[in-house]
C-alpha cells in the first residue's frame, strides 16, 4: 500500500513538473531589453514602472499571448471562435467587449466594421502571396515585393490574427468613401476615437507610430488586439506596446 502511495505521489509530482515546464516554455518570449522600452512618460524610470504594474498581471495570461516575427505561434489547436453578423470570425472572448465598444462609439457618432479577424496559417500565407503578386504587377522586383509585404504581412505562423485576439477595425464612413487599410486613416476622427477609447474595453492599438523597432511592423491605426481591461489600461496610460509590457512583467517575475 505504501509503495502504491509513493508511486502515485511521484506520478503527481512528475505531472506537476511537466505542466510547470510547459507554462515556462510557453512564456519564454524573445522580448526587448529594458533599455529599449519607450514610455509616454519620459520621466518615469523602468523600476518605477515595474512597481506600478497591475498586481494581478502575469505574463502567462492567455490574453497576453505574444505572436510576432520573433515569437511564432506554436499552438496547433484552433482558438475558440465566434462569428459576427458580417461573417467575420474572432476569439469568443472578444464578443462582449467588442459589442460594448461599438455601442459606446455609436453614442459618440462613430460606427465601425471589422474588416479582418481570425485568420488561419493557410489564409495568412495566401494573403502574403497575393500581396507579393500585387507588388510584382506594379513593377517591383521579387526582392522588393517581398520586402514591402513583410512590412505589413507577418509570416504565416507569426500573425496575431492566428490567435483570434486581433481585429482590423475601420470606420464605416472611411470605407464608404473608398478608404482602405492606410496609415492616413489615423487622421480621421473615427480612428482617433478608437486610439483614445479602445483600452476602456480591453483593446490596445497594437502597432503604434514610432514603435516599429519594437513591434517589427509599420504603424497600423486599424489593428487592435484584445488583452483585457486591466492590461489595456496600463499599456495605454504608459504608451507601451505588448512587447514592452511583457518585458516589464518578465523582469518583475524574475525578481
Question: Where is each model-derived feature located?
Answer:
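Sec-dependent N-terminal signal peptides of Gram-positive bacterial secreted proteins and lipoproteins
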Residues: 1-25
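Extracytoplasmic cell-surface/polysaccharide-interacting catalytic and binding patches
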Residues: 18-255
Amino acid at each position: 500500500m505504501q509503495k502504491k502511495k509513493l508511486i502515485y505521489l511521484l506520478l503527481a509530482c512528475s505531472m506537476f513538473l511537466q505542466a510547470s515546464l510547459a507554462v515556462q516554455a510557453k512564456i519564454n518570449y524573445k522580448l526587448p531589453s529594458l533599455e529599449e522600452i519607450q514610455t509616454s512618460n519620459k520621466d518615469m524610470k523602468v523600476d518605477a514602472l515595474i512597481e506600478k504594474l497591475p498586481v494581478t498581471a502575469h505574463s502567462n495570461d492567455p490574453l497576453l499571448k505574444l505572436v510576432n516575427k520573433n515569437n511564432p505561434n506554436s499552438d496547433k489547436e484552433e482558438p475558440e471562435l465566434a462569428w459576427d453578423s458580417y461573417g467575420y470570425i474572432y476569439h469568443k472572448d472578444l464578443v462582449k467587449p467588442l459589442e460594448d465598444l461599438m455601442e459606446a462609439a455609436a453614442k459618440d457618432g462613430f460606427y465601425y466594421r471589422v474588416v479582418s479577424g481570425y485568420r488561419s496559417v493557410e489564409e495568412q500565407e495566401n494573403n502574403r502571396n497575393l500581396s507579393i503578386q500585387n507588388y510584382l504587377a506594379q513593377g517591383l522586383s521579387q526582392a522588393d515585393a517581398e520586402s514591402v509585404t513583410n512590412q505589413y504581412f507577418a509570416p504565416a505562423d507569426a500573425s496575431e490574427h492566428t490567435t483570434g485576439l486581433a481585429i482590423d477595425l475601420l470606420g464605416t464612413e472611411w470605407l464608404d468613401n473608398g478608404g482602405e487599410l492606410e496609415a492616413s486613416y489615423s487622421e480621421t476622427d473615427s480612428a482617433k476615437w478608437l486610439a483614445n477609447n479602445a483600452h476602456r474595453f480591453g483593446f490596445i492599438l497594437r502597432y503604434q507610430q514610432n514603435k516599429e523597432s519594437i513591434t517589427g511592423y509599420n504603424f497600423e491605426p486599424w489593428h487592435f488586439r484584445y488583452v483585457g481591461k486591466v492590461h489595456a489600461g496600463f499599456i495605454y496610460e504608459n504608451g507601451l506596446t505588448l512587447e514592452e509590457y511583457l518585458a516589464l512583467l518578465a523582469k518583475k517575475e524574475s525578481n
